[in-house]
Amino acid sequence: MGCLGNSKTEDQRNEEKAQREANKKIEKQLQKDKQVYRATHRLLLLGAGESGKSTIVKQMRILHVNGFNGEGGEEDPQAARSNSDGEKATKVQDIKNNLKEAIETIVAAMSNLVPPVELANPENQFRVDYILSVMNVPNFDFPPEFYEHAKALWEDEGVRACYERSNEYQLIDCAQYFLDKIDVIKQADYVPSDQDLLRCRVLTSGIFETKFQVDKVNFHMFDVGGQRDERRKWIQCFNDVTAIIFVVASSSYNMVIREDNQTNRLQEALNLFKSIWNNRWLRTISVILFLNKQDLLAEKVLAGKSKIEDYFPEFARYTTPEDATPEPGEDPRVTRAKYFIRDEFLRISTASGDGRHYCYPHFTCAVDTENIRRVFNDCRDIIQRMHLRQYELL
């Protein structure tokens, strides 16, 4: 019996030893995971709808992952290239849908605007009728006549005049870009370029995480939907983020939001920024402000058709600050406009600033890869300092 007792004790000892070793392994892994987690910079992308958040994420993939492939983790270049081509093929449908939505929206708006817009060539009316007849066709297969009608209409001066008034209705930003490329997109062997994929508009619903590495530093970027009904989901992302990147469509000063067709888009962005800046859960998280769509802002300002002071009367009294640094060759009117918009946001951050978090503004053009590369490089030092502060190492 004694031997049996000893044998049982031996089994118990072995089991306890194995358990201790297992616990050690688990503890070691937990410590390792904790170190990786603490070493990761988590960036939360926020902003109103259609400000360019998803385009910023696409640029991170181009710059720091493997472009437009599935996961971005392939070490085999051939596999990465294969995945990239596969994803581009699936995006063709999204691009065609953007093209269809663009021409449909413009021709449908012609009769609804006040005053309405007439076709320059009345013989194109049958083309308008065709476009409107296929507006709600599910799984549309894009026959040759669609491209023929769309191209002829896009060349009609009346349709162009309606496009010029697109701030009076809801039109996707990429409309002109894809309508100008009808002859390319209609080809059976069409493969989208990176620029096509950057321009492609697909509504973001839910929360998407993109992981990438820059100089051996891990970044996790969270992109959430910008429309009002998506915002309640944001709180899930707020836990332990290093910084918020708040994206603004600077060119939206003369537009209204899709949700109610009344609220000014830039005012909506200012209101949202204020609510985030003053949120009690975010009082220690600094904000990197991307004043986006600078290319479209410059176009609008120089066209002179929609004046900022008609929407923001205080612009009439605004003077460009002395410390402004315009881009080479930039028109002074553009410089004044972009700094006015910047200062509207800084007014919010300085009014309620308590020294616990800061706002760092940058002028961006999300579809310009080199611009985003330069801006993100400028931001990395700021993000690093935020990260050190987050874990009280600074």
UniProtKB/Swiss-Prot annotation:
One of its GO terms (cellular component) is ruffle. Residues 39-394 form the G-alpha domain. It comes from the Eukaryota. GO terms for biological process: adenylate cyclase-activating adrenergic receptor signaling pathway; adenylate cyclase-activating dopamine receptor signaling pathway; adenylate cyclase-activating G protein-coupled receptor signaling pathway; adenylate cyclase-activating serotonin receptor signaling pathway; bone development; cartilage development; cellular response to catecholamine stimulus; cellular response to glucagon stimulus. Residues 219-228 are annotated as: G3 motif. Isoform Gnas-3 is abundant in brain with intermediate levels in skeletal muscle and very low levels in other tissues. A lipid is attached at C3 (S-palmitoyl cysteine). It is a lipid-anchor. Keywords: Cell membrane, GTP-binding, Hydrolase, Isopeptide bond, Lipoprotein, Magnesium, Membrane, Metal-binding, Nucleotide-binding, Palmitate, Phosphoprotein, Transducer, Ubl conjugation. It catalyses: GTP + H2O = GDP + phosphate + H(+). Residues 1-23, 68-90 are annotated as: Disordered. The modification Phosphoserine is found at S352. Belongs to the G-alpha family. G(s) subfamily. This protein is produced by a bicistronic gene which also produces the ALEX protein from an overlapping reading frame. The GNAS locus is imprinted in a complex manner, giving rise to distinct paternally, maternally and biallelically expressed proteins. The XLas isoforms are paternally derived, the Gnas isoforms are biallelically derived and the Nesp55 isoforms are maternally derived. This is Guanine nucleotide-binding protein G(s) subunit alpha isoforms short. It comes from Rattus norvegicus (Rat). The lineage of its organism: Eukaryota, Metazoa, Chordata, Craniata, Vertebrata.
